[in-house]
Swiss-Prot record:
It is found in: Cytoplasm; Cell inner membrane. Gene3D superfamilies: HflD-like (1.10.3890.10). HAMAP family: HflD_protein (MF_00695). This is High frequency lysogenization protein HflD homolog. NCBIfam families: PRK00218.1-2, PRK00218.1-4, PRK00218.1-5. SUPFAM superfamilies: YcfC-like. PANTHER family: HIGH FREQUENCY LYSOGENIZATION PROTEIN HFLD (PTHR38100:SF1). One of its GO terms (cellular component) is cytoplasm. Belongs to the HflD family.
Amino acid sequence: MAKNYYDITLALAGICQSARLVQQLAHEGQCDNDALNTVLRGLLQTNPSSTLAVYGDTEQVLKMGLETLQSVLNANRQGEAAELTRYTLSLMVLERKLSASKSAMNTLGERISQLDRQLAHFDLESETMMSSLASIYVDVVSPLGPRIQVTGSPAILQSPLVQAKVRATLLAGIRSAVLWQQVGGSRLQLMFSRNRLFKQAQSILAHT
């Protein structure tokens, strides 16, 4: 069956957008709020009509992720680009561990469905919601291992709010990685279909 590289690239961009946001948070203590909102909202889409619907039905909101994906595919193994590649691959590894555990997947689904009650009272980007999302990551994903080593400014990373945002963003990255697998993504494509993925990202970016 032919792979749908459009859907695969969108889901990859979702993973990469989370990776870039984690990097921004770890180094600067803040991040692009619109890009963050996009990946966090994706967590709440449990029955989307399409891959794009997970992110809000517009390619524009994945611009950061598509640009980051191109950077990862360019295989720059230095500095910040190497960090992005490490985060992206680590999220993919964790997703495989999560998907292999039926009980963890069930718990994750239950915990995410419970967020609706809180969202009736709090904004998605509020400290309360960040804390709730972070606790889901700590309780459900972290025990599966291996831990994702987040590097940045030690002073910034000591902030409880930054820690919560980083974990919430990693959880959103896992959601995109689950989607990526569902639409036919695999790590082999990052080696053998690099050109095709790069061109697909370029093509989508041309419309944004």
